[in-house]
């Protein structure tokens, strides 16, 4: 048995019990944001939406308003389960011929699919699909929530203003993607420090934070302008311009995305 300390650490999570409600996410502060919504009288969907927006600030390597997802909602009085599908979609102009297989094994991604030339399907502007997250949250709130859109974004805005804590896990995830992040000025500026992953201090002390001024500004605008601005308004124009400048094919027509109505 290898007793090397660096290879034998055990990470544990304490069990939590509640008679009223529990919020679970990949970041404690995001879960706290959702729990606070419940404590203030919001329902489970209100808490889920607030948590989702907040975790997009605190866990950007797995969550974000540029992504998508699915939601299941159980209505206890009726016993019905409702589903909302707001997954990403391929851009209208996408041509599979632009993504030839390289024959070099599997991708350098979480998913072991066949590798594409230059990793075009997982890195850079050519990997960006039509995002459904923002509209999915709109559909959830309008059909099952009790809070306003603006209220629901406040925890995420507060988290963005405070900045993301750079702990060992954040350093690990950013470091693992540093080569790709260095390729583009915007991601290099956002996540790296002088081209290197940010890191917490070796000794005890205040944990450094990474601030995302552009994301903070975007969330504030989204809270005021409403969710459809992301697909039809100023944010949509900025999104398309930036992606086009980097070689992507996302268009304004692609962004005319409307999440389907909830289904049982």
What positions do the PLM features span?
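A short, hydrophobic C-terminal helix/tail in secreted or cell-surface proteins
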Residues: 260-264
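Noncatalytic scaffold domains of N-terminal-nucleophile
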Residues: 1-32, 36, 44-225, 230-232, ...
């Amino acid at each position: 048995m290898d007793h090397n300390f660096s290879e034998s650490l055990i990470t544990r999570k304490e069990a939590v019990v509640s008679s009223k409600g529990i919020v679970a996410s990949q970041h404690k502060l995001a879960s706290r944001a959702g729990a606070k919504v419940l404590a203030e009288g919001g329902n489970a969907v209100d808490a889920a939406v607030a948590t989702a927006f907040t975790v997009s600030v605190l866990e950007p390597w797995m969550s974000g308003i540029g992504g998508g997802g699915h939601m299941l909602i159980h209505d206890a009085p009726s016993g019905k389960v409702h589903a909302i599908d707001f997954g990403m979609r391929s851009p209208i102009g996408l041509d599979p011929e632009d993504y030839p297989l390289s024959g070099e094994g599997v991708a350098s991604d979480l998913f072991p699919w066949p590798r594409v030339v230059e990793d075009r399907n997982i890195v850079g502007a050519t990997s960006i699909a039509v995002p459904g997250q923002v509209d999915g949250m709109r559909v959830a709130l309008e059909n099952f929530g009790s809070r306003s859109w603006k209220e629901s974004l406040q925890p995420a805005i507060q988290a963005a203003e405070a900045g993301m804590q750079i702990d060992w896990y954040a350093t690990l995830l950013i470091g693992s993607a540093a080569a790709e992040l260095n390729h583009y000025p915007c991601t290099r500026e956002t996540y790296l420090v002088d081209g290197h992953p940010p890191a917490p201090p070796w000794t005890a002390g205040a944990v450094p934070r990474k601030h995302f001024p552009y994301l903070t500004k975007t969330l504030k605008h989204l809270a005021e302008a409403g969710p459809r601005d992301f697909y039809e308004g100023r944010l949509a124009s900025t999104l398309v311009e930036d992606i086009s400048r980097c070689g992507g094919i996302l268009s304004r027509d692609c962004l005319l995305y409307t999440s389907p109505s909830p289904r049982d």
